[in-house]
């Protein structure tokens, strides 16, 4: 596998919630981050251009795109994947898909939270995506993989007083900064065409391939 250089310029995209964000990193060091809360109405390309401008990094300097693949807003994640596919097609950048709940756990750990915590995302239809992580000084560890749970299981966690966080539960959302930080330490690059949103229930509609947005060189 290709090795990850500490100085690799990373563009990170996290659109799995209504708090959409884009970050530019140099290895694991954050150079710039732009966040909007308008959700799907956000002009994604403008958000990327704003982050690149703030970081003073040109499109051609980006070597890797790290994209949050959910679980979360299927529409938002598909939009982020389409952007990533366009960039790889046009500029040949490396690509990584990052679990959005893992990025959320990384953000909580970086912010000082410790111990076991359940991360929850509303999956609609009375169901929730749940995953459990252990946060420590050494990092994060997934102790219960993401699964689709009924509302009752989610409510039992709340009534039992277990720490539960996630989009819609206070001001906690996956952030592009932490998507990029996770990608900075890895070398599991993929073809952007292989990326798919984390979606644990059977699709009940026909997926139409998204139109790729190819950045001008």
Provide a role label for each language-model segment.
Residues 35-37:
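Surface loop/turn motifs at the tips and blade-to-blade linkers of beta-strand repeat domains
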């Amino acid at each position: 596998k290709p090795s990850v250089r500490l100085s690799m310029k990373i563009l990170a995209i996290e659109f799995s919630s209504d708090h959409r964000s884009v970050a530019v990193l140099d290895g694991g060091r954050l150079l710039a981050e732009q966040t909007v809360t308008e959700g799907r109405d956000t002009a994604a390309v403008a958000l990327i251009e704003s982050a690149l401008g703030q970081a003073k990094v040109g499109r051609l300097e980006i070597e890797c795109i790290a994209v949050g693949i959910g679980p979360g807003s299927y529409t938002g994640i598909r939009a982020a994947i389409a952007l990533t596919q366009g960039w790889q097609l046009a500029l040949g950048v490396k690509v990584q898909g990052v679990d959005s709940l893992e990025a959320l756990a990384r953000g909580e750990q970086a912010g000082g939270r410790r111990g076991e915590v359940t991360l929850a995302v509303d999956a609609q239809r009375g169901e929730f995506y749940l995953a459990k992580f252990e946060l420590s000084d050494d990092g994060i560890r997934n102790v219960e993989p993401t699964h689709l749970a009924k509302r009752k299981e989610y409510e039992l966690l709340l009534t039992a007083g277990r720490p539960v966080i996630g989009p819609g539960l206070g001001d906690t959302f996956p952030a592009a900064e932490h998507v990029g930080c996770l990608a900075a330490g890895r070398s599991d690059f993929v073809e952007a065409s292989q990326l798919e949103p984390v979606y644990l229930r059977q699709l009940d509609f026909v997926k139409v391939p998204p139109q790729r947005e190819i950045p001008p060189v």
